[in-house]
Amino acid sequence: MTERDREANEYVLGTHRVELLRLGFQHQVWAPFTSSLWQRAGFGPGQRILDLGCGPGYASFDLAHLVGDAGEVLAVDMSQRFVDHVQEQAECRGISNLRAEVQDVERLDVAAGSLDGAFARWVLCFTSDPAAVVAGAALALRPGGRLAIMDYCNYRGLIVAPHSPEIDTVISATFLSVTRRGGNMDVGQDIPAMMRSCGLEVQSVQPIVCAAQPGSALWRWPETFFLGYLTTLLEMELITEDEADGFRRVWT
């Protein structure tokens, strides 16, 4: 991908076709956890739900089926390319209760009290002002509406056994790279306080801890991210070529 192909509001790994496929695989891996979150939030038929930072819309499509024809999903993202993809796929799939818009989630433009629910997955960790995202979503919720968030809480808690310094180096560099971009890969620790400051009642906090075997889908999920992100870490001079090669050798 050339610089000319890049969007002004680029994702960490871009918005090109390879990233579409990676995000699709990611959604498949995490769909059971996501569906469980929606169930606990009470999302269901006839509701109006906001998908914050929808990306290419994989969760948005599932939400559209969940709320049914009597409901509606508003999917917002900073990427015009991803929003176009959502709209095209919705038309191809005959999904008429899904609307996608280009919006900055830190400056949400949704009518106050117009939503039954809002959802964000791995969005707040990449924003420079996650409290503004939470506040905007809270304002858009009707009384009794629910905000459901899935995000990282202890990113450097990702470990492999036996211990690998090569993998530790890349995990730490990834954490630092997001910090330099204004994000926080441990944002989950702060989300409950953000919610309370907006007048929301925190009803549930559920940690997700998983163990994966090499070759499994859950193992391949971080693999697809890290192997693609090594180039960015090299460009940011957060790792060396030898460290990148060491990660590839150990992980694969």
Residue positions per predicted region:
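N-terminal, positively charged/glycine-rich alpha-helical extensions of SAM-dependent methyltransferases
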Residues: 1-20
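C-terminal helical/coil "lid" or tail adjacent to the Rossmann-like core of SAM-dependent
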Residues: 12, 18-19, 30, 203-252
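Conserved alpha-helix/loop element of class I SAM-dependent methyltransferases that forms part
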Residues: 28-47, 62
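Class I SAM-dependent methyltransferase SAM/SAH-binding core
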Residues: 50-52, 56-107
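A short acidic, Gly/Pro-enriched loop at the edge of an enzyme's catalytic core
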Residues: 108-117
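A short SAM/SAH-binding and catalytic strip from SAM-dependent methyltransferases
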Residues: 116-130
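A short glycine-rich, Lys/Arg-flanked "PGG" loop and its adjoining helix->strand segment in the class I
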Residues: 131-146
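Conserved catalytic/acceptor-binding region of the Class I
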Residues: 148-216
